[in-house]
Amino acid sequence: MHDVLIIGSGVIGMSIARHLSATHLDVAVIDRDVPGKHASYKAGGMLGAQNEFTEDSDLFQLAIESRAMFPQLSKSLLDETGIDIQFKNSGLIKIANEHDDISSIKRQYQFLNSQDRSVKQLSDDDLLQLTHGEVKPSYAAIHIPHDGQINAHHYTLALLESMKLRDIKRYASTEVTSIAVSYTHL
């Protein structure tokens, strides 16, 4: 019997299991097939904590807090597993490639800049300079300097290795089709 069962061994499930294992709970992860081979395996590695927000919310605040943890998480995983997730605080450029995207990106800029004054609108010259000429001018662009990226494949491998080192039980090739809830008193 386990204290906690986590369904899904993508990066979210493995991260939760890794964190909970430090509390001395008996944690196990169930996966329908091979761990880390779906969305986690295909991810590009962009953290994008601010990328989709146009207003303040609990989720926005959680995303910002999560992003702030990546430098230490990267070091912790490297120390524990020897796998470098290649965290880079490289910033993020968001571009409006179509005229219809201009109002959306400007609304997002207004919100993000109100939360972080380092978020800037980019002129065509700014965009060319920031990307060393690799990105052509667009309808509108913003720069989010405090965002970052990781190597998603290395992140998945590091979390998987961490689970092994922590003896977190994994049930692979096990599909959960329903959950039965029962209450017992200790």
Predicted regions and their residues:
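Glycine-rich FAD pyrophosphate-binding loop
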Residues: 22-41
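Conserved dinucleotide-binding and phosphotransfer motif residues
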Residues: 23, 115, 166
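Helix-loop-beta segment of a Rossmann-like dinucleotide-binding subdomain
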Residues: 83-94, 108, 121-124, 128-162
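A conserved beta-strand/loop element that lines the FAD pocket in flavoprotein oxidoreductases
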Residues: 166-176
